[in-house]
Regions:
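N-terminal glycine-rich phosphate-binding loop for ADP-containing cofactors
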Residues: 1-191
């Protein structure tokens, strides 16, 4: 629904969707990007920010932020590589261009991370260029290191204590994470 959408068009569309397709309709304000992109990008950007804060590697974060959290098994950074870092940057730019601090309290969280800018400048767009946060060379998987701007051997896993924590009932899991002293636990609490 936009300011220029005619009410009759919405009424006709809703009648068709409910009567002919048997679907329910959720009325929403017009907003840039698909809701999944907007929520997904916000989550990915929050994760990227905390990676910088805690100094974790992308392979460890993917291990923590994937299946163990009930998310896609590919985790945050592998998912970004599959989607395409240029596509991700485009979605971020659309949000930056169409939102403002006055219209969205989370506007400042849609800043493009340094690592994403660096990879784009290098021409590393993810899976489509065979290099992004990860790069496969033969049978070896490498991960990007922002400090050296080189690829290093990947495959490091999260500390098993966090895998066990994440299997606990919600209340116990949250208490354990809130009190975690290790960087990985503090990272999980932060995201």
């Amino acid at each position: 629904n936009t300011p220029t959408t005619q009410a009759q068009v919405l009424d006709d569309l809703e009648a068709f969707v409910t009567s002919n397709l048997g679907k329910g309709v959720v009325h929403a304000k017009d907003s840039p990007n698909f809701i999944a992109n907007r929520v997904g990008i916000a989550g990915m950007l929050a994760t990227m920010k905390e990676v910088e804060n805690f100094g974790l590697t992308y392979d460890v974060v993917d291990d923590l932020s994937g299946k163990k959290l009930g998310r896609a098994s590919s985790g945050t950074f592998r998912t970004a590589d599959v989607v395409g870092l240029d596509t991700m940057a485009h979605v971020i730019k659309t949000l930056q261009d169409t939102l403002s601090i006055e219209t969205d309290p989370f506007y400042e969280s849609f800043a493009t991370p340094t690592v994403l800018k660096t990879l784009l400048e290098m021409g590393n767009l993810g899976q489509k260029t065979k290099a992004g946060f990860f790069k496969k060379v033969g049978r070896d998987v490498l991960r990007f290191d922002l400090d050296s701007k080189e690829y290093m051997p990947a495959g490091e896993k999260a500390d098993e204590v966090y895998a066990r924590m994440l299997k606990k009932p919600a209340a116990e899991r949250l208490k354990l994470l809130r009190n975690a002293e290790g960087k990985q636990g503090q990272f999980l609490w932060a995201i």
